[in-house]
């Protein structure tokens, strides 16, 4: 419970402002410090590592206090935001020197994890999205996303699964949900991050329709394809409402709302996206992601665009081929690639600088850098336009979107000094010759010291005494004379202060000069501020061409990055077409091969999947042999091909894939009461209900979370379903330890067995990591356990038990369904066990007619043709015989 704060005038003002933002940490400007009080102070001290103190606050009361100097805001604000806290910045709105009353204060900015504009909080190559999720009843919803730092505004409608994938891909820093929908959000979505609850009216459709039209400058949303999409209007408008609530009103850079077109994107569900480690390794401290391998971008907006390309691979063949041709050109022409990279280095974050212009937050130094960036954009255009048209028409067409903005460059260069400061008031901003009054005032200010020296010499000679002229904040300019000479001071001087051994005086000419010089400095500050704001307004007229330039440079940067990684890593250009075959020759895992120790090479493998021949590959082999890597490798090569990248292989032919689905690795959700097996079955069911003829499916160890026979039966049935599915023949890689599944090759024409080879040499495992035709009969589990450091006594005992179980399976077929007895291990001091004599005797030797009947029935079973389902039915039949009264 919050402690009551005694309302002194200052604290009363604080409480009134705090009441408007109870869920935010309030940074309250007091003099040269930002202060926090009470619970805010406790939280700030913990997050920032600053001292928590107490101050008197009325009779027998105290209040917690923590603060930091105002100039350290850029240091401490990012820490609060990254801790997931909303921060309200309350500044002094008037000069304390000009008022004798309580200084007027107000909120100048409300910073939240999703609404950030400061470079010190933002990550260069990551977007900082604010999301709004609208979930009415009915199973459909909408998600809108805005990066206020770039102006990118997106919206999409769809199923819960689609929206969950978008959350995984875009990774917003903050999600807005209706207060009443919070519990449903937590139950439904796997995404975990900062969620802020808002009132229902925030998503009101009709109000939001008008708000969107006003922001985007349109009379109707029809041209954006949103007129008949109330779900999209609700979520997109909610974002604009939230920006208004957080005092972000300068939004002229938000000029369009783009729908995320699911029809043009490869489908990747959220689990597949995470398990393939596309943007982030599942163990970031040790591993790398696909993004880490492919990202050689130079500009921040190029890095952000590459993340989006990897999140949403294309299924548009024309666009894939366009990117491929540009990448191929840049692979061939290393000199052009190098020169483009040098130009990109001079452009910086054009996208975010443009947004700062719109919000009126661009600094003088950034404005000057903008002119330099536009010069570099011109160099890019010149480089590409000089490139032969016949070599790559698409590259030149892309560069044609660049606008040089030469008039703007000239305006900035003429208006600003060559090296302007980072902020107004810290040095000369406006160049000489722009404003005559400013030039005169600067001349007065610059030559003021010369005047003071002359005045000091003149007065000293006239009075015949030594003296000095100085300045302080109390008296302004004054003359200081030692006590020994005060008797010779002119009568026109006025004494202002007596010191030990000296007196301080003023006289009329000195005060006149003071008024003039101090007035000049204040006037310079006002004039520079006005002239600079006029320049920013002129720059703002170019927001749309600047945004187009940023988008074009980002594309060129991404394509150049893909060309550089292709050249460096020996990638090849894949054939991508409308065929139904995936044929990869000597494919390599793009991430693993970059992590291998120096001198060690990745073992390449061929993979061929086709709807008419090898639709399903059943892959067996021991743990650590490389089955999982092979599955992921195939998926990543396919994904890379469909963003327009070259791929790690000797050759690759990719028939267009519309979705990749994986069931790879365990993903327990114990906190929700869901076991590994339950989650596995849910994910498998989702895949089977979503597949198409152009899907690529990866199953790794499906069914291992339950009993052996249950697992085999489920895996068998799923393979049959995928093979016989009337809606299409999805290409499937099925890695398993269930060697019984090898029998499917002889039963289903498009199922082929492969194994990742391994050998046991003198008791040691040798992993060859080569995919070869045919199934494997051994898992080498005990050998892998030995490699993992399992105590020798355990692996020796496990070997004994394995031999007994294999003998029982081989010789006691009639023991099906009965308990197998294992001989007890010998005590450490005893001699080793003598053989496998402890396997249970056959109970069919007993003189019992029912057991004899069972024996006859079992002997009639053809084990070679028995399916798992038929075996389970036979067991049920035998069980009924044993339990039926005779």
What are these regions (language model features)?
Residues 38-41, 229, 298, 303, ...:
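ATPase nucleotide-binding head domains, primarily ABC-like/P-loop NTPase cores
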Residues 2-329, 338, 345, 349-358, ...:
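Charged catalytic and DNA/RNA-contacting regions of genome-maintenance
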């Amino acid at each position: 419970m919050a402690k009551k704060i005694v309302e002194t005038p200052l604290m009363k003002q604080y409480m009134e402002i705090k009441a408007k933002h109870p869920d935010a940490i309030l940074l309250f400007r007091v003099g040269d410090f930002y202060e926090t009080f009470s619970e805010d102070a406790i939280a700030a001290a913990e997050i920032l590592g600053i001292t928590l103190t107490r101050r008197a606050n009325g009779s027998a009361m105290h209040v917690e206090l923590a603060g930091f100097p105002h100039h350290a805001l850029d240091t401490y604000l990012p820490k609060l935001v990254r801790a997931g806290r909303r921060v309200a910045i309350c500044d002094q709105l008037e000069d304390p020197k000009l008022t004798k009353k309580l200084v007027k204060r107000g909120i100048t900015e409300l910073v939240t994890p999703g609404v950030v504009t400061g470079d010190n909080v933002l990550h260069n190559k990551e977007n900082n999205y604010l999301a709004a999720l609208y979930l009415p009843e009915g199973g459909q919803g909408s998600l809108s996303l805005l990066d206020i730092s770039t102006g990118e505004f997106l919206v999409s409608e769809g199923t819960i699964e689609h929206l969950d994938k978008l959350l995984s891909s875009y990774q917003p820093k903050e999600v807005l949900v209706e207060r009443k929908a919070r519990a449903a959000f937590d139950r439904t979505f796997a995404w975990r991050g900062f969620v802020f609850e808002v009132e229902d009216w925030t998503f009101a459709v009709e109000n939001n329709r008008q708000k969107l039209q006003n922001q985007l400058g349109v009379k109707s949303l029809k041209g954006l394809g949103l007129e008949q999409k109330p779900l999209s209007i609700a979520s997109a408008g909610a974002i604009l409402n939230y920006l208004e609530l957080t005092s972000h009103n300068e939004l002229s850079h938000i000029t369009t709302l783009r729908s995320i077109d699911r029809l043009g994107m490869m489908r990747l569900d959220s689990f597949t996206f995470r398990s393939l480690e596309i943007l982030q390794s599942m163990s970031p401290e040790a591993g790398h992601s696909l993004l880490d391998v492919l990202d050689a971008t130079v500009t921040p907006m190029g890095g952000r665009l590459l993340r989006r390309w990897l999140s949403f691979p294309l299924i548009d063949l024309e666009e894939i081929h366009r990117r491929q041709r540009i990448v191929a050109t840049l692979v061939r022409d290393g000199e052009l690639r190098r020169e483009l990279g040098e130009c990109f280095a001079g452009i910086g974050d054009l996208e975010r600088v443009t947004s700062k212009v719109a919000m009126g937050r661009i600094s003088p130094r950034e404005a000057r850098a903008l002119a330099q960036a536009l010069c570099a954009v011109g160099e890019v255009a010149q480089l590409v336009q000089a490139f032969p048209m016949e070599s790559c028409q698409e590259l030149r067409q892309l560069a044609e979107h660049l606008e040089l903005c030469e008039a703007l460059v000239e305006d900035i260069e003429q208006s600003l000094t060559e090296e302007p400061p980072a902020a107004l008031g810290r040095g000369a901003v406006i160049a000489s010759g722009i404003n005559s009054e400013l030039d005169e005032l600067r001349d007065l200010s610059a030559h003021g010291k010369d005047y003071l020296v002359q005045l000091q010499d003149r007065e000293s000679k006239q009075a015949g005494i030594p003296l000095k002229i100085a300045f302080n904040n109390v008296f302004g300019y004054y003359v200081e004379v030692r006590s020994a000479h005060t008797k010779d001071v002119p009568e026109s001087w006025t004494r202002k202060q007596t010191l030990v051994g000296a007196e301080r005086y003023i006289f009329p000419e000195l005060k006149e000069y003071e008024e003039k010089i101090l007035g000049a400095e204040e006037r310079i500050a006002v004039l520079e501020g006005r002239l600079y704001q006029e320049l920013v307004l002129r720059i703002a007229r170019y927001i749309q061409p600047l945004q187009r330039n940023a988008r074009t440079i980002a594309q060129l940067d991404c394509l150049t990055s893909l060309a550089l990684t292709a050249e460096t890593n020996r990638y090849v250009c894949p054939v991508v077409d409308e065929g139904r075959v995936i044929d990869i020759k000597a494919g390599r895992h793009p991430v693993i091969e970059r992590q291998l120790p120096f001198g060690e090479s990745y073992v390449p493998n061929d993979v061929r999947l086709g709807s008419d021949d090898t639709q399903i590959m059943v892959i067996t082999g021991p743990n650590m042999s490389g089955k999982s890597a092979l599955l992921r490798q195939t998926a990543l090569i396919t994904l890379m091909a469909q963003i327009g990248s070259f791929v790690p292989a000797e050759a690759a032919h990719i028939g267009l894939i519309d979705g990749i689905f994986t069931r790879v690795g365990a993903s327990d959700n114990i906190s929700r009461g869901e076991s590994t097996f339950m989650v596995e079955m849910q994910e498998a069911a989702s895949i089977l209900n979503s597949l198409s003829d152009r899907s690529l499916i990866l199953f790794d160890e499906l069914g291992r979370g339950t009993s052996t026979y249950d697992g085999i039966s489920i895996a068998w049935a799923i393979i049959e379903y995928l093979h016989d599915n009337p809606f299409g023949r999805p290409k499937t890689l099925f890695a398993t330890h269930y060697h019984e599944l090898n029998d499917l090759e002889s039963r289903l024409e498009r199922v082929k067995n492969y194994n990742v080879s391994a050998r046991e040499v003198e008791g040691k495992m040798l992993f060859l990591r080569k995919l070869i035709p045919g199934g494997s009969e051994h898992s080498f589990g005990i050998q892998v356990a030995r490699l993992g450091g399992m105590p020798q006594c355990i692996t020796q005992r496990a070997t004994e038990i394995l031999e007994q179980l294999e003998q029982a399976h081989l010789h006691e077929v009639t023991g099906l369904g009965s308990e197998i007895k294992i001989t007890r291990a010998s005590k450490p001091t005893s001699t080793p066990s003598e053989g496998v004599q402890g396997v249970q005797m056959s109970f069919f030797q007993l003189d019992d007619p029912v057991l004899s009947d069972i024996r006859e029935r079992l002997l009639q079973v053809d084990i070679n043709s028995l399916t798992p389902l038929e075996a389970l039915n036979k067991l049920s039949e035998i069980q009924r015989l044993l339990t039926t009264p005779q």
